[in-house]
Amino acid sequence: MARKTPLNRIRNIGIAAHIDAGKTTTSERILFYTGVSHKIGEVHDGAATMDWMEQEKERGITITSAATTCFWKDHQINLIDTPGHVDFTIEVERSMRVLDGAVSVFCSVGGVQPQSETVWRQANKYGVPRIVFVNKMDRIGANFYNVENQIKLRLKANPVPINIPIGAEDTFIGVIDLVQMKAIVWNNETMGSKYDVEEIPSDLLEKAKQYREKLVEAVAEQDEALMEKYLGGEELSVEEIKKGIKTGCLNMSLVPMLCGSSFKNKGVQTLLDAVIDYLPAPTEVVDIKGIDPKTEEEVFVKSSDDGEFAGLAFKIMTDPFVGQLTFVRVYRGKLESGSYVYNSTKDKKERVGRLLKMHSNKREDIKEVYAGEICAFVGLKDTLTGDTLCDEKNAVVLERMEFPEPVIHIAVEPKTKADQEKMGVALGKLAEEDPSFRVMTQEETGQTLIGGMGELHLEIIVDRLKREFKVEAEIGQPQVAFRETIRSSVSKEHKYAKQSGGRGQYGHVFIKLEPKEPGSGYEFVNEISGGVIPKEYIPAVDKGIQEAMQNGVLAGYPVVDFKVTLYDGSYHDVDSSEMAFKIAGSMAFKEASRAANPVLLEPMMKVEVEVPEEYMGDVIGDLNRRRGQINSMDDRLGLKIVNAFVPLVEMFGYSTDLRSATQGRGTYSMEFDHYGEVPSNIAKEIVEKRKG
């Protein structure tokens, strides 16, 4: 079976947005106009095809990125729906990794919101070119030009409108295409499937000319030949303008900006045209970096059908009918179902039972998959998110994704004995699917703890336990993931010697402990010279310290951000062993930490609260009581926006308190930002409570 769509006609795109910008509705409309779904699923009545997990239908938010294939004007679009809630940023990171381009959806009323900033940062991190779609132009308070300014100010980007709205709110009927300089007006009777191309209304001609001028200037900057033509007063052709927009979009010096109303079926076809005109094909993005596992040298994987198979597993899902689905982005070569692949991250071979092309919740079996495609593999047992699958003879490890540590833990108890075993299996499966979710057993109490990125994240996990795995579980009070660190440098010596009968134990080390920058982690430096400690014992010292740092001296929390230098010591020909040096390292670290001015750290959340002005005073007072530090206060559409850092431990139950303080009119969002030092009086309480 040969490839159906040439590689240069494939677009792997994601639709990324803030919770209520209308992302799922936009994805739905894309599927409708490209002829995939016959009845449009509305999020308002809980029936969108992309949102296929039960909880998403209830909450009306998108949690798992479903990958869907559709076709538009001889191009194949693989659409990855990304979640917009902060607790699910890991999903967004993951989809960004395998996308070639993105459509950022903004609400014409709400504009740039905190989550939009996070998603924008992630797209910058992975170098994903994007176009902006300003949605909900039919809503009261819709303002396209406002959003344009916010993108400049808040996202520090360069938005260049390629169409502008005709009317707004109730009078929004279409757009002016600035490339063709024509008006496009949608027909309400045909669900927006048909539209008329007309002359630009006279009252908008001036504005259209002004924005066309801005567009042409931005395009001319992309190319010297175009710049000369532009400065010489010559008109640029439609083809030249399109080419310039694409160049700028791909090098990320400009962001093409369009508008519409997905819910009212206006502007979706123009968005699809922009996707195929301006977003990159797999052949137009930078070659993906990888490492040759044998030589550890950097190699580049070029997207093409020639060459050996290479792909990245970016998502794992459990499907009730087929078992485990591993979503893979294929970067190079092709693969047939039933063949073997090599997992270079784990150094294991796996057999691919079936290849499935997903359409949000329907599936189609395919015989083989080619470069540039996104496909679900069935039958892989050991492959996890972020693993590379490739050909064994031409192995490569594509760069790994980085996953954040959980900031909140909750104890879960199965309701019955029968649930006990099922719960262990279920939590294991969920942890495979979601690397930002962790499961552990608390040593002192033997309780099972689950950790994640926020309360909503864990609520959904517990909900999935009940629905998908039929496990009833009780949950405890949320617990915050505190950390410890040191504030001063200390040198310590520890000699571990046991010589009473039989073979003795002897390990002797001198270490220097120093604080490091927040977030920089642990570093071990070996400065032993002249063989005072034999080479084979040095890793044991490092290991001893790494084990000891899991339980800090203050309250038993993990110790972070410090450097240990092993600079001297001694050994015994007969009695020294790895074990002895491990113990010596661990004891030296504990003694040094006690003397190094240890402090407690807590997760600080970046909180943004949006409230009507009359509640502003109460909300700020409340945030101050929660030990928050207010960073800024802004206005957005008649509401006050408060930005603050607040300790996570003070934020439990905040949504209920905010609702009652603002009569349900306040909203907030929060995401983990950094670890901050706990004030000494509060640290004292925490330590006493831990030591019971």
From Swiss-Prot:
GO molecular-function term, one example from the UniProt record: GTPase activity
InterPro entries: EFG_II, EFG_III, EFG_III/V, EFG_IV, EFG_V, EFG_V-like, EFTu-like_2, G_TR_CS
Pfam families from the UniProt entry: EFG_C, EFG_III, EFG_IV, GTP_EFTU, GTP_EFTU_D2
Domain tr-type G: start-end pairs: 8-283
GO biological process: ribosome disassembly
Cystine crosslinks: none
Residues at which GTP binds: 17-24, 81-85, 135-138
Native organism: Helicobacter pylori (strain HPAG1)
Localisation per UniProt entry: Cytoplasm
Gene3D superfamilies named among the record's database cross-references: 3.30.230.10, 3.30.70.240, Elongation Factor G (Translational Gtpase), domain 3 (3.30.70.870), P-loop containing nucleotide triphosphate hydrolases (3.40.50.300), Translation factors (2.40.30.10)
SMART domains assigned: EFG_C, EFG_IV
Family membership noted in the UniProt record: Belongs to the TRAFAC class translation factor GTPase superfamily. Classic translation factor GTPase family. EF-G/EF-2 subfamily.
HAMAP family: EF_G_EF_2_B (MF_00054_B)
Superkingdom of origin organism: Bacteria
Cellular component GO terms, alphabetical: cytoplasm
Function noted in UniProt: Catalyzes the GTP-dependent ribosomal translocation step during translation elongation. During this step, the ribosome changes from the pre-translocational (PRE) to the post-translocational (POST) state as the newly formed A-site-bound peptidyl-tRNA and P-site-bound deacylated tRNA move to the P and E sites, respectively. Catalyzes the coordinated movement of the two tRNA molecules, the mRNA and conformational changes in the ribosome.
Annotated protein name in UniProt: Elongation factor G
PANTHER family: RIBOSOME-RELEASING FACTOR 2, MITOCHONDRIAL (PTHR43261:SF1), TRANSLATION ELONGATION FACTOR G-RELATED (PTHR43261)
Lineage: Bacteria, Pseudomonadati, Campylobacterota, Epsilonproteobacteria, Campylobacterales
